[in-house]
């Protein structure tokens, strides 16, 4: 049988052995032609504990890294966007990942203040799945919920006229089924999680 695992939960390692195996595969693929062990940069949430930092470093070392550089995710995201964070001006950056939302103010190449919550993309997907199951008797997998979120999900000003057909399995008959949902309906399904994310940003 096929077992699917999530080695990362909430932005930190939840399955140490799986993350170590995954890192070994990634390093082997990226460093096929290298004679020496590579130096590795790891992105970590800005709110991780010292224990979680050490776990990330240890996993990378066991996977074959020679040296590890830990970069806080908001800094990495800002650099990836081409945002100039070297000036003495505050830049608000919100990173909504899978397991965590990080809200940070960056200035002078550093995180000045930060806040984090464990409500993010995965929680929004689950809210959509729960709504379709409870209100439409339709079971959908996480990839379908993700697609719904990307296609008609919104955080403000939902359009009640915008619609999407969602396919899944009908809970009563067990047969393939579908439902037409509106953007307003999906926004309402995610409302509680969106409020938590907004509170994290304002916090």
Name each model feature, range by range.
Residues 1-96, 104-203:
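Nucleotide/phosphate-binding catalytic cleft detector across ATP-hydrolyzing
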Residues 99:
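Conserved Rossmann-like nucleotide-cofactor binding loop
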């Amino acid at each position: 049988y096929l077992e699917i695992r999530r080695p990362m939960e909430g932005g930190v390692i939840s399955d140490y052995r799986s993350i170590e195996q995954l890192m070994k595969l990634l390093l082997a693929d990226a460093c096929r032609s290298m004679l020496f062990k590579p130096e590795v940069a790891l992105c970590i949430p800005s709110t991780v504990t010292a224990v979680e930092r050490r776990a990330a470093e240890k996993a990378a070392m066991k996977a074959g890294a020679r040296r590890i550089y830990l970069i806080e995710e908001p800094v990495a995201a800002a650099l990836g966007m081409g945002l100039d964070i070297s000036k003495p001006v505050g830049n608000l950056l919100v990173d909504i990942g899978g397991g965590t939302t990080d809200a940070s103010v960056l200035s002078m190449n550093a995180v000045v203040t930060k806040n984090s919550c464990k409500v993010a993309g995965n929680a929004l997907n689950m809210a959509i799945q729960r709504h379709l199951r409870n209100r439409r008797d339709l079971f959908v997998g996480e990839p379908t919920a993700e697609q719904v979120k990307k296609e008609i999900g919104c955080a403000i000003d939902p359009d009640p006229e915008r619609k999407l057909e969602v396919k899944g399995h009908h809970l009563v008959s067990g047969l393939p089924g579908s439902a037409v949902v509106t953007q307003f309906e999906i926004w309402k399904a995610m409302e509680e999680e969106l409020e938590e994310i907004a509170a994290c940003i304002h916090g």
